[in-house]
A protein has these predicted regions:
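Soluble non-transmembrane domains of integral membrane proteins
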Residues: 517-608
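Hydrophobic alpha-helical membrane-insertion segments
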Residues: 46-61, 129-142, 279-287, 356-367, ...
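A conserved hydrophobic secondary-structure block that centers on an alpha-helix together
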Residues: 11-25, 29, 95-227, 235
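Membrane-interfacial loop-to-helix junctions in multi-pass inner-membrane proteins
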Residues: 29-50, 109-133, 196-217, 242, ...
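Transmembrane-helix bundle segments that line or gate the permeation/cavity pathway
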Residues: 50-79, 86-111, 139-149, 250, ...
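Contiguous transmembrane helix-bundle modules in multi-pass membrane proteins
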Residues: 1-34, 52, 66, 244-252, ...
């Protein structure tokens, strides 16, 4: 009965989504306030029904209701309860229900927190989000119903959750990623609503920007969590593989980064209006592309769900409809909102435009490398692999250029900046950056140009931020001046510092890692990177749904024992899958990583040992960027009720066609 109620709730949510997708838009077109007012209650009801459907599916997992096909395929009586909970979104049908729920949640949040918007604008925004909901709910109900029954042939037990997904990181990684993916639908909806109304002004950018920043922050943290999971779970110490599905989440993040900066220019200066709406369309379109890649069956990946062709065709059709429709609307309406506001060469507008172009080129390069092998295979049957050499050769220089531009962009002013003043600000920053980079290279030991270059760029970005703080607080005193700066400013500073930290982590762990694969018998020791690793053998261990050989490795720094690690080789009994669980001694400046390979004769094992310097800085920097986004979105100016348009408050002239 509970699964049937969940299925009914999805159908009712679809009905409300249809109402939300049609009547408010018609009402905005006709100027009918009653029809426009239907948008908010429809959004509330849709979210409530989706939450109920999700709760029904969760309940089915918790009570081991194997009459539900999705539960039988992804759970087991021996599965711990917390993995039963994460199994709700562990495969295609449940993950799509989670997607629909999060979309409903974003829509509900917009309906609640955007009441200060003009009535027509809010009706259009919620109407566009309703159209997106209709597409996903139709896909969910028609092709991917998670409540399908196995009656009367109910299995006695389930097939168990994929062992790769039985990990804490995979409990939180997909929801965070989906919050970002789906969150870009809000920016998309604001852009389409503004196009429909012909008002891509500073007010639109101000309303849209906090939602976009929050989605960007969630997506960035989700990507970082996925990288962290791959590092410790897959057993060989890698943290980024340029996997097509990794790329599919990274591309909208890059375009989203460009979008939040472009929105800032539109909000402050009323320029880049058409470009900004194009970025909003691109960010959400790339999110849909990621959905297609994961669920269409065109990829073989640890991330991809096995799916039938019908699902792929449905998502591809929806993707083409959204992209084609939005670009057609853009082509028709963009000329209406052209701006005639000018700015100089050495201005923040120019530097942010350069920022945008670099990020879009980087995303386009990744898109080409991801899709070209798929298109070639589909058209000719030829197999081609585009791997890390291609991506690294193009992406790394672009990010170096981005960091160089970023530091200048922080210091320049809106509209125009005197070149002499700018050089006076940048010269001490450059001198100090060179000195710090040389010092860091000396401390690193082995000289490497890449280490010197990235240390220089990281110092350049960090010191430029400090120079800007000093400039903004010089009249009020340091502490009083810092207190007067808004959360948006501090969020920007934290995010930029996070980029510098992440870049340092990437280059230092890439060039400074030690790795060794060897045979180790009980009692045998090996020296690596100044540490001594002593293998004491492996013992049998039983878990709730697996058996394992658990090794013991003691690590010494000189004569001092600093860690005891327990890497495992697990056999998940239901699916007979063998998994490697690494033992990791984590530190701020290095990780000691030990993984078991295959058992050998006389109690010996193949053992892999890594020393990863500064690898945690990669995820620390990503978290700093994400939390910087949340801090910026919490700025008080985004929480103030605005009764007049921002463009009027800023004194900007009306854009002419």
């Amino acid at each position: 009965m509970i699964p049937e109620l969940g299925h009914l709730a999805m159908i009712l949510a679809l009905c409300l989504a249809l109402v939300q997708a049609t009547l408010p838009l018609i009402g905005a077109w006709r100027g009918d306030r009653q029809w426009m007012s239907l948008a908010q209650p429809a959004a509330w009801g849709q979210f409530a029904f989706l939450a109920f459907a999700f709760a029904c599916l969760t309940y089915a997992f918790m009570i081991d209701d194997f009459s539900v096909a999705y539960v039988a395929q992804n759970s087991n009586t021996a599965l711990p309860w917390y993995y039963k909970f994460s199994a709700v979104w562990g495969a295609h049908e449940g993950s799509l229900l989670l997607w629909a729920l999060i979309l409903g949640g974003w829509t509900f949040a917009v309906a609640i927190f955007s009441r200060q918007l003009p009535e027509e604008m809010l009706a259009r925004v919620l109407g566009v989000m309703g159209i997106i909901s209709v597409g996903f709910l139709l896909f969910l109900i028609v092709t991917s119903n998670p409540f399908t029954r196995l009656l009367p042939n109910v299995p006695a037990d389930g097939r168990d959750l994929n062992p790769l997904l039985q990990d804490f990181g995979l409990i939180i990684h997909p929801p965070m990623l989906y919050m970002g993916y789906v969150g870009f639908s809000v920016a998309f909806a604001f852009a389409i609503a503004a196009l429909l109304g012909g008002k891509l002004d500073a007010a639109w950018a101000r309303w849209s920007r906090p939602w976009t920043i929050i989605a960007w922050a969630f997506l960035g943290i989700g990507i970082a969590l996925g990288s962290w999971w791959a590092y410790y779970e897959l057993g060989w110490g890698g943290w980024w593989f340029w996997d097509p599905v990794e790329n599919a989440s990274f591309m909208p993040w890059l375009v989203g980064t460009a979008l939040i900066h472009s929105l800032a220019v539109t909000e402050k200066r009323g320029v880049f209006k058409s470009w900004t709406v194009l970025l909003a369309i691109a960010a959400f379109s790339l999110s849909l592309l990621g959905t297609f890649l994961v669920r269409s069956g065109v990829l073989t990946s640890v991330h991809a769900f096995a799916s039938d062709p019908e699902r792929g065709v449905f998502i591809l059709a929806f993707l083409l409809l959204v992209v084609g429709g939005s670009l057609t609307l853009f082509a028709l309406r963009a000329p209406v909102v052209r701006s005639q506001v000018g700015f100089g060469l050495w201005s923040r507008e120019t530097l942010l435009l350069a920022n945008n172009l670099i990020l879009v080129v980087a995303a386009s390069m990744i898109l080409l490398g991801t899709l070209y092998p798929l298109v070639l295979d589909a058209l000719s049957g030829a197999k081609l692999s585009v791997g890390p050499p291609y991506f690294n050769a193009l992406f790394v220089p672009l990010m170096g250029l981005l960091m160089a531009v970023l530091a200048v962009g922080v210091l320049v002013r809106w509209k125009d900046t005197p070149l002499r003043w700018l050089l006076g600000m940048l010269t001490p920053v450059l001198v100090a950056s060179v000195a710090l980079a040389l010092l860091a290279s000396l401390l690193w030991g082995d000289f490497h140009w890449a280490v010197l270059g990235v240390c220089l760029l990281a110092a350049w970005v960090t010191l430029a931020g400090l120079r800007d703080i000093q400039d903004k607080t010089r009249h009020k005193g340091l502490f009083k001046g810092m207190a007067s700066l808004g959360r948006s400013y501090w969020g920007m500073q934290l995010a930029h510092l996070g980029l510098a930290v992440c870049a340092l982590g990437v280059i230092l762990t890439s060039l400074g890692s030690f790795e060794r694969d060897m045979r180790m018998a009980p009692g045998e020791a090996v020296e690596l990177g100044g540490y001594r690793f002593v293998f004491e053998g492996a013992a049998h261990h039983e878990g709730p749904n697996f058996i394992s050989d658990r090794g013991t490795v003691r690590i010494f720094d000189g004569e001092k024992q600093i860690a005891v690690l327990h890497p495992e080789k697990r056999l998940y009994t239901v699916q007979q899958s063998v998994m490697t669980e690494a033992g990791i001694d984590a530190g701020l400046t290095r990780d000691l990583f030990v993984a078991l390979g295959e058992p050998l004769e006389q109690g010996a094992w193949a053992v892999r040992i890594h020393i990863k310097p500064f690898v945690r800085w990669i995820w620390l920097g990503a978290l700093m960027m994400g939390f910087g986004g949340f801090l910026a979105a919490a700025d008080k100016r985004y929480r103030m009720k605005v009764k007049t348009r921002v463009r009027d408050a800023l004194g900007l002239q009306e854009a002419r066609a």
